[in-house]
Regions:
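Short hydrophobic/aromatic-rich beta-strand segments that constitute the beta-sheet cores
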Residues: 67, 95-97, 149-151
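Short acidic-glycine-tyrosine-enriched beta hairpin
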Residues: 107-135
Length: 157
């Protein structure tokens, strides 16, 4: 009987004591600031006279954070089912967002491009700025020399 009581007390003590912390899953991928700088330099070297380069940086399954290197503006765009989140890494430019896309045409699944945006809002962009363009909102990047973004698409909920 004494052994049973001691075993019960020991079990209760074990249940009340905090156990070791459960291991947290590590990120699927990571990139240091030095690695990002090296990738941006490599992208610039590979581009030559090109005006746009895209390179995935980190990913977890289908979710990808990628570097976008712009030397010249592209066409205004709309991602009907995805928001676009980005951090300016280098360079400068402008973001025009909102308004109405003129002459919209689906150029590939998930991307509608047009000739211009009427009535959008303009915002200057520089290193450290963060943007979030909601799904379905027209947007366009003006480029001043170069604009390097770290961005990802976020599915519409």
């Amino acid at each position: 009987m004494v052994i049973a009581k001691l075993a019960g007390v020991a079990l209760a003590a074990l249940l009340l004591c905090p156990g070791p912390a459960m291991a947290q899953s590590a990120p699927a991928d990571a990139a240091s600031a030095a690695e990002i700088r090296a990738k941006v330099a490599a992208m610039a070297a590979r581009m030559g006279k090109g005006t746009f380069a895209y390179e995935p940086l980190v990913k977890d399954g289908e979710t990808i954070a990628a570097l976008e290197y712009w030397k010249a503006p592209g066409k205004p765009a709309v991602h009907p089912d995805e928001a676009e989140y980005a951090l300016v890494i280098e360079g400068a430019g402008t973001l025009v967002s909102g308004g109405t896309m003129v002459e919209p045409a689906e150029t590939r699944p998930g991307l509608v491009e047009g000739s211009r945006i009427d009535g959008g809002s303009t915002r200057r962009l520089g290193p450290g700025d963060v943007i979030l363009v909601p799904a379905g909102v027209p947007h366009w990047f003006g480029i001043e020399g170069k604009l390097v973004l770290l961005g990802m698409k976020l599915p519409r909920k």
